[in-house]
From Swiss-Prot:
PANTHER family, alphabetized: ATP PHOSPHORIBOSYLTRANSFERASE, ATP PHOSPHORIBOSYLTRANSFERASE ATP-PRTASE
Pathway the protein takes part in: Amino-acid biosynthesis; L-histidine biosynthesis; L-histidine from 5-phospho-alpha-D-ribose 1-diphosphate: step 1/9
Documented activity regulation: Feedback inhibited by histidine.
Lineage start: Bacteria, Pseudomonadati, Pseudomonadota, Gammaproteobacteria, Alteromonadales
Name of the featured protein: ATP phosphoribosyltransferase
Length: 299
């Protein structure tokens, strides 16, 4: 029997979210080692068990209360929720936050020779997909009838193989579509990875641990989106220089030893500091400009 006192987190065993999910948890201070032959990894420093499962199993495990947290793509989450609602199975959860990885879109695509005008061009045609519920909802909203061809993988080859007239599949860069003689026509759903929590009541100890993981995840993501900027600036152009720093709030201004005409500026920026901005800073007399990544942030 599983130890219900330990926090159970479901993550993708393999695939596009697996590595980044593990890295996020490690960045949050969860120490664990993954054995590829085992589906459960036990944290060394916290009462946490990681369940490494298929991505389409994660929503159900969370909704059924088998695990406490899950890291999953919103596309898989939404697809499974619609399916479970249809079957009158538990389908509720708490979305704790979206994450900064796993971005993609679910799109309709057709062969290059297809004369596509709008979504009504697909009326009465056959569409191959791994996401029948999301596709069905979109087409119902548009009032378009069609037939679907359910495939678990390699959806992009369906038109060429004569299985369908069009496809509905995940797109990141569009390179796979292009390689298979297809072009994107409609985005029907935009997705990113997210952390979800079971609606089951948690013990006080587990909820404290969940809050800690969430707080640390927030700090890790803020740090990834931020840069630490240090520079020296003439006092006569100080206000202009501060105004140029993108997204900087309340920078720290410190005097320089034995130089009353210049100060040191320390700032956290939540936007990219591009080369042209650095050149403008230099033109205003700034020097020793350093832009550094931030590993962790809190508060």
């Amino acid at each position: 029997m599983p130890n219900t006192q330990r926090l159970r987190i479901a993550i993708q065993k393999s695939g596009r979210l697996s590595k980044e999910s593990q890295q996020l948890l490690k960045s949050c201070g969860v120490k664990f080692t993954v054995n590829e032959q085992r589906l459960i990894a036990h944290a060394d420093n916290m009462p946490i068990d990681l369940l490494r499962v298929r991505d389409d199993d994660i929503p159900g495990l969370v909704m059924d209360g088998v695990v406490d947290l899950g890291i999953i793509g919103e596309n898989v989450l939404e697809e499974e929720q619609i399916e479970r609602q249809t079957l009158n199975k538990p389908s509720t959860f708490i979305k704790l936050r979206e994450l900064d990885f796993g971005s993609c879109r679910l799109s309709l695509a057709v062969p290059n020779e297809f004369d596509y005008q709008d979504v009504s061009s697909l009326s009465g045609l056959r569409i191959a997909t791994s996401y029948p519920n999301l596709l069905r909802r979109f087409m119902a909203e548009k009032g378009i009838s069609y037939s679907d061809c359910m495939l678990k993988g390699s959806v992009e080859v369906a038109p060429r193989a004569g299985l369908s007239d069009a496809i509905c599949d995940l797109v990141s860069t569009g390179a796979t579509l292009e390689a298979n003689g297809l072009y994107e026509t409609e985005v029907i759903y935009r997705s990113t990875a997210c952390i979800i929590q079971s609606n089951e009541a948690q013990t006080a100890e587990k909820q404290v641990l969940i809050n800690k993981i969430l707080s640390r995840a927030n700090g890790v993501i803020r740090a990834r989106e931020s840069k630490y900027i240090l520079l020296h600036a003439p006092t006569e152009t100080l206000e202009q220089i501060i105004a140029l720093l993108p997204g900087a709030e309340n920078p720290t201004v410190l005097p320089l030893n034995d130089d009353t005409n210049r100060v040191a500026i320390h700032a956290v920026s939540t936007e990219d500091l591009f080369w042209d901005t650095m050149e403008q800073l230099t033109a205003l007399g700034a020097s020793s400009i350093l832009v550094m990544p931030i590993e962790k942030m809190m508060g």
